[in-house]
Amino acid sequence: MDAIKHIDSFFMRNFIRDVKEKQGQDFYVFGEFWNGNEEDNNTYLEKIEKRFDLVDVSLHNNLHKASTAGSDYDLTTIFDHSLVKNHPEHAVTFVDNHDTQRGQALESTVEEWFKPAAYALILLREDGLPCLFYGDYYGIEGEFAQENFQEILDTLLYARKDLAYGKQTDYFDDPNCIGWTRSGNEDGSPLAVTISNDAANSKSMEIGSDWAGQTFYDILGNCSDTVTIDEDGWGDFPVSEKSVSVWTIQD
């Protein structure tokens, strides 16, 4: 539902209650409560008794700031004050939308160089319900034109659908280079992600001794190197300058 900050929260709480009583509890609803203040979001969720989810404006703001600040942004703080950190089961995550694109009243576009990393941050982690922006997938024409990211997004969507499962372990220990791993499900291979907002770098991360000797490659093609997991289950996963890499087992 759009622009719910202009609608009384008491009404919204009871309205969604009535809708779900008629349509069933699995009738999904989320709202655009356009407010980046952490406490305001916490209070609103309490007022509506968490009967529907909210778009994560705070995370979008963090992604926008990260894209404009470049290497001056501390990537270890990318989820600070966000809904997905405070209320992961009620956060609808997004990178950009029709309000934040260039030329709009709430313009706060995530710069193109950072969009692949931003989408990896919402698509390949265990928390939040991610949304793709039409303009990012298909591109935007006209005065405020933007290239499309369809090829990159298709690869990230494949990784989410087939690889992004299991325990998540974060390696947020460097302001300019972060990473995380997903252990995979019983039938799938693990996944590793590295992001840099500065120079080329690498991140030592544990995949597990069961995968010792296996070779990993970057499915985004941003790093041509491969990574071999050592006998203790660790690998040194590189990332190019101001880039993102998504690593999985090479067939």
Where do the PLM segments sit?
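Active-site-proximal helices and loops of the catalytic beta/alpha 8
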Residues: 3-251
